[in-house]
From Swiss-Prot:
PROSITE patterns: RIBOSOMAL_L21. Part of the 50S ribosomal subunit. Contacts protein L20. This is Large ribosomal subunit protein bL21. Belongs to the bacterial ribosomal protein bL21 family. HAMAP family: Ribosomal_bL21. This protein binds to 23S rRNA in the presence of protein L20. GO terms for molecular function: rRNA binding; structural constituent of ribosome. It comes from the Bacteria.
Length: 107
């Protein structure tokens, strides 16, 4: 069984007990969270697709930890104008473990 849900403007395909990396969530490590914007659920040969979301369906997850990704460098440069701008960015993330995919509408 797998599900597709939306978090932080992105879509993620998950299975039970899978650990995924999401955009930063404002939940403390060790807390349990629920995602209710479920786009699709597939169980064996049965597929349910939401319009746009499935009602009565939730994904339960455990917040493992927070962190930051590797630094990326941004460089702007104009030749012959003596202009060079260098900038860096480190994106925050949250690791989440999927505990359960609940489908209250059906089996």
């Amino acid at each position: 069984m797998y599900a597709v849900f939306m978090s932080g403007g992105k879509q993620y395909r998950v299975k039970k007990n899978q650990i995924i990396q999401l955009e930063k969530l404002n939940n403390s490590p060790g807390s349990i969270i629920e995602f209710d914007k479920i786009l699709m659920i597939s169980a064996k040969k049965e597929v349910k697709i939401g319009e746009p979301f499935l009602k009565g369906t939730k994904i339960k997850a455990h917040v493992e930890n927070h962190g930051r990704l590797k630094k990326i460098k941004i460089i702007k440069f104009n030749r012959r104008k003596h202009y060079k701008k260098k900038q860096g960015h480190r994106q925050y993330f949250t690791n989440v473990k999927i505990l359960d995919i609940n489908n209250f509408n059906g089996k």
